[in-house]
Amino acid sequence: MTTFMNNKTKSAGFTFKQFHVSHDKCAMKVGTDGILLGAWASLQGNRYLDLGTGSGLIALMLAQRTQTDCHITGVEIDPSAYRQATENVRQSPWADKIQLEQQNIVDFTRTCTKKFDTVLSNPPYFEQGVDCRDKQRDTARYTQTLSHSDWLNLAADCLTNTGRIHLILPYAAGKNLQKQTALFCARCCEVITKSGKIPQRLLLTFSKQPCTTEQSRLVVYNEQNQYTEQFIALTRDFYLNF
């Protein structure tokens, strides 16, 4: 989903109510997917992990939403995105809450000795065979060596026994992941771009513990191409124009 809000822009980025995200050095720009995930994910515990942090958007959203004693770790493989995320964090009010690591997620999860209460990820979702002609963007978006199931299992390796994993995926990919994983789906939200359309994305929460799935639906635009009250309520704490 490539919908963008009309927030004030500076330094090729977006200014939110409490922080600014520059993204001109990042393959993946600030967009609705990441913002939805950062606003929708439930808060649990005080150790948070953002796998594939990119510009640092989700880590910064978590920092705004959580208490002062919480700690957020962001992992990013791309050197340019990592440097930009580091600068975005440094200029934010929460530099003391966020730690960034430049690693691929396989190495990070294999060497990480601590467990996290909450893991978030807006993972790659283009399958191989789609030529985007940009190596940096290729790294950020392709499912090349890791399937979504692999990605979820790596996230689970870092999770406490009672923790939660939150993802956003294309609708079909999300449905397939629900069938493939041994984890339990605690929440499933269908994201519809405009009223009357079919769902394009799934917001998903997974747990190691057995649970029933809380089903919901989120519509971004109504039939008059205006943001729905539901979407505004979810993102109100972040967008300048809400």
From Swiss-Prot:
Superkingdom, natural source: Bacteria
GO biological process: methylation; tRNA processing
Keyword annotations: Cytoplasm, Methyltransferase, S-adenosyl-L-methionine, Transferase, tRNA processing
E.C. code: 2.1.1.223
InterPro entries registered for this protein in UniProt: DNA_methylase_N6_adenine_CS (IPR002052), Methyltranfer_dom (IPR025714), SAM-dependent_MTases_sf (IPR029063), tRNA_Adenine-N(6)_MTase (IPR050210), tRNA_adenine-N6_MeTrfase (IPR022882)
Matches recorded under Gene3D superfamilies: Vaccinia Virus protein VP39
Function of the molecule: Specifically methylates the adenine in position 37 of tRNA(1)(Val) (anticodon cmo5UAC).
Main localization, broad class: cytoplasm
Record Pfam families: Methyltransf_31
Localization per record: Cytoplasm
Family: Belongs to the methyltransferase superfamily. tRNA (adenine-N(6)-)-methyltransferase family.
Transmembrane feature ranges: none
Name the record gives this protein: tRNA1(Val) (adenine(37)-N6)-methyltransferase
Reactions the enzyme catalyzes: adenosine(37) in tRNA1(Val) + S-adenosyl-L-methionine = N(6)-methyladenosine(37) in tRNA1(Val) + S-adenosyl-L-homocysteine + H(+)
Top EC class, one word: transferase
Species of origin: Mannheimia succiniciproducens (strain KCTC 0769BP / MBEL55E)
